Structure formats: C-alpha cells, structure tokens
C-alpha cells in the first residue's frame, strides 16, 4: 500500500496507524511517501539529496522505497552489464537462469550461451574495479544453471 502524506510527520497523522493495521491484516506492506519532501528533493543533486535525507534520518527517498517495493511485489530483480558503449540495468523475474537473462539483451546471447562471469555489485564497489575483484577471486564463472541474483554485474560469454 502507498500512503501519501503532505507532512513528514507520520506519527501525527491519524490515518497512518489505521493504514498500517489494514496492511498487517492483509499481509501487505506500507510505503509512506511525503509529497512535500519528494518535491523538495526532486530538484537536488544526488549528493545534496543524500546529505538531506541523512540529516532527517532517512537512507533513501520515498520514490526509491516505492520502486523497491514494486519490484518485490512483482517478483523482479535487476542485473547490470558494463561495456564500452554503456552501463545498463536489465530487469528480469526472480528465478531466471543466466542463459535466459542473456537472452534479454539479444537472442544470440541466449542461443550461444557459454558462461557468465559474475560479481555482486557490492563486491565490485568495495574493490573499485573488476580487475581488483578478479585478483581477490570474487568474479565467478557460472554456467547454464546459475540463477541470477539481484545486483549481479555480468559479462556473458557466448558463441554463435
């Protein structure tokens, strides 16, 4: 459930607790969003937005929380590819195996799938580069049965 508030003070909103109770009864979740806050941060740079959110005790915007909740509800995840022309996120359903994920990029990738070189986004960021992560053995070679994970950074090897 999405709960839209014009004030950032959810505790003082008499309807918020009612919505939480309904969500609990329906085995659902509530994503509170403050319209004024979202409007304020929409024009900020990423750096200013993160500083502002940290100052008010939040780690991410309501919009980001809404997107994550939507992905969870729909059973979706994202994986990343990085090459010379672009870095891109691809959306797939949970449980998708590597060859089918490769097919989202191009049907030839699925047809000629050999393997996927995979590293988690967190490991990549922590190490600064794929080369540094490879030195530590964090880049894995996965086969046709590998089930893609949210945040995988992948290089698909294929031959057609």
Name each region found by the language model.
Residues 1-2:
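Short, small-residue-biased leader/transition segments that mark boundaries at the very start
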Residues 6-83:
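Canonical P-loop GTPase G-domain recognition
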Residues 158-159:
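Short, surface-exposed secondary-structure boundary micro-motifs
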Residues 5-8, 54-56, 66-67, 89-95, ...:
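Short linear motifs at secondary-structure transitions and domain/linker junctions
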Residues 15, 35-43, 86-155:
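Nucleotide-binding motor/catalytic cores of P-loop/tubulin-like NTPases across gene-expression machines
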């Amino acid at each position: 459930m999405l709960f839209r508030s014009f004030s950032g003070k959810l505790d003082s909103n008499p309807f918020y607790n009612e919505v939480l109770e309904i969500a609990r009864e329906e085995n659902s979740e509530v994503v509170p969003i403050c319209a004024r806050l979202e409007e304020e941060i929409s024009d900020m740079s990423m750096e200013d937005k993160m500083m502002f959110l940290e100052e008010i005790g939040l780690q991410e915007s309501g919009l980001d929380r809404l997107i994550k909740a939507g992905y969870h509800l729909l059973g979706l995840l994202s994986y990343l590819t990085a090459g010379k022309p672009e870095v891109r996120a691809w959306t797939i359903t949970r449980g998708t195996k590597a060859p089918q994920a490769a097919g989202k990029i191009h049907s030839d990738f699925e047809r000629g799938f050999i393997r996927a070189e995979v590293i988690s986004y967190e490991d990549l960021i922590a190490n600064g580069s794929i080369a540094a992560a490879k030195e530590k053995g964090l880049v894995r070679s996965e086969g046709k049965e590998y089930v893609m994970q949210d945040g995988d950074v992948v290089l698909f090897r294929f031959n057609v």
